[in-house]
A protein has these predicted regions:
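Short glycine-rich phosphate-binding loop at a beta-alpha junction
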Residues: 1-11
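Glycine-rich, often acidic, oxyanion-interacting loops/wings at catalytic, nucleic-acid
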Residues: 77-174
Length: 355
């Protein structure tokens, strides 16, 4: 049974997870054509009917993210990290702005410092009494509080990146083995694909998702393509960072391709776009072959088979989709909570061992 749900990445996320847990196939319903909506009108019953028609007709076939595993945890952490990074940049701008307008004695004391040295020095200062009305004292107090705030944001970012590193190594260590891919970049790409990357049917679909698939813009005898402005822009930025790092570190394959395409009269910008597409192909292969090191999943499978319980029966008793439990058992997914629940369920039905 297929069910069409609109907004599976926002208001429909909870409904989508519940339907997946019930064993139903969820299909993402795209936004209706505006011209057709103006002609038919707008209401909840009409929208529901149109969604059902789209699913039955097969015009909407996109499978949404399952949002029920470690990759969903990465999405939450990345959102927190972006917020902390924005706050860190904002407070640095406030420090520089205050130093520009502060009294000369304050400006002179910190003029030779910049960057993290400036922040560390400001955080160690003792600005004086809080009851003072002297602008120089108040400026020092404010600068110290700004510096402490910046250090707090940096500590939060470091902690988040440690968590992301652990999660990525559990879910897909293959991504980290690619040149130019770190924990944050890997997590960004994993979040773009979701907990169920097999929903992306081809390399081209992942390239379109990441906004690196060129859009045909030919006319007559002129053949050309234009840049895609759509797709997941976080994933697009992650691919861009990978290419920049490979060029910066003179990665042999990248530089050989760069020089060959430059000899073909392509601009550096066009070559960057081509390289991003090649990197997207590498990432897609890694997403489908994660080689996750999850021996606990294999042990769970051996335990289940020793008891003689079919995987479909165990999945139904746990209230989870069969595919989710299967990915855990074959080692392509890390899911400590599901692993714990499955172990408890198997232990409860295991026959007592006789001496």
């Amino acid at each position: 049974t297929r069910v069409g749900v609109a907004g599976t990445g926002s208001y429909g996320a909870g409904l989508s997870r519940a339907l997946n847990a019930a064993g139903l196939t969820v299909v993402e319903v795209a936004r209706q054509d505006r011209q057709a909506r103006r002609r038919r009108g707008k209401s909840d019953p009409l929208d529901a009917h149109q969604a059902a028609v789209a699913v039955l007709a097969g015009t909407d076939t996109a499978i949404p993210k399952s949002g029920d595993g470690a990759v969903e945890s990465m999405r939450i952490l990345l959102a927190e990290r972006r917020s902390a990074a924005k706050a860190r940049a904002q407070v640095m701008n406030q420090i520089h702005a205050l130093l520009i307008t502060a009294p000369e004695l304050v400006r002179q004391a910190f003029r030779a410092l910049s960057g993290q040295r400036l922040v560390n020095t400001l955080a160690r200062t003792r600005p004086g009494s809080e009851a003072s009305a002297d602008p120089a004292v108040v400026a020092r107090q404010t600068l110290r509080r700004f510096a402490v705030r910046q250090l707090t944001m940096q500590a939060e970012i470091d902690l988040i990146e440690q968590q992301l590193d652990l999660l990525v190594r559990q879910v897909n260590p293959t991504l980290l083995s690619l040149s130019g891919v770190g924990p944050v970049t890997a997590a960004t790409l994993l979040v773009a694909a979701g907990d169920n990357p097999d929903r992306l049917g081809s390399r081209a679909s992942f390239a379109a998702l990441a906004g690196v698939a060129p859009i045909p813009a030919s006319s007559g005898q002129r053949t050309r393509h234009r840049l895609s402005r759509g797709g997941n822009r976080h994933a697009n930025a992650a691919l861009h960072r990978i290419v920049l790092l490979r060029i910066r570190h003179r990665e042999p394959r990248t530089m050989a391709y760069f020089e060959r395409r430059r000899a073909e009269q392509l601009t550096d910008r066009d070559i960057m776009r081509c390289l991003k597409r090649h990197v997207a192909n590498e990432v897609y292969a890694a997403l489908l072959n994660p080689a996750a090191d999850n021996p606990a999943g294999r042990e769970l499978r051996a335990h289940r088979q020793a008891i003689g319980i079919p995987i479909s029966v165990l999945a139904a008793s746990l209230g989870v989709p069969y595919q989710r439990l299967r990915r855990l058992e074959i080692g392509t997914r890390a899911d400590p909570e599901l692993e714990r629940r499955a172990t408890i369920a198997l232990d409860a039905i295991s026959p007592p061992q006789t001496a």
